[in-house]
Amino acid sequence: MVLEYMDNTKNDHYFLDKIKTDIAFIVDHMKGVDAQELNDNEILLDSMLFRMIQISENAKKLSADCMEKTSELPWNELIGFRNRIVHDYGNVDLSIVFETLKYDIPVLLSQLVDIDSGME
């Protein structure tokens, strides 16, 4: 039925699931990785940055209602991070990237799991 696809709740769950999948990928692949390894491993770095871009792109597709209900999450920072990666790739501070991937992203995953279970 056409109306099912217009249901923002389903769309929000879909995009939140995609965001959680990308975050879980980052958490899994950053285990045991230090800043030097991330800096030296171009494939790993590109993969992590691609996932961050995807997280941001999907965050931008969340409804205003969902963003408001989850306003404690750093949506604007995620979107800004994406813009920095995409538009100023050569000047991205890898120490900030590492800190974000290693320490901030796992916390975000935990928050999303808690929020998503509360939305059901």
State each model region's role:
Residues 1-120:
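Solvent-exposed interaction patches of small proteins and small membrane subunits
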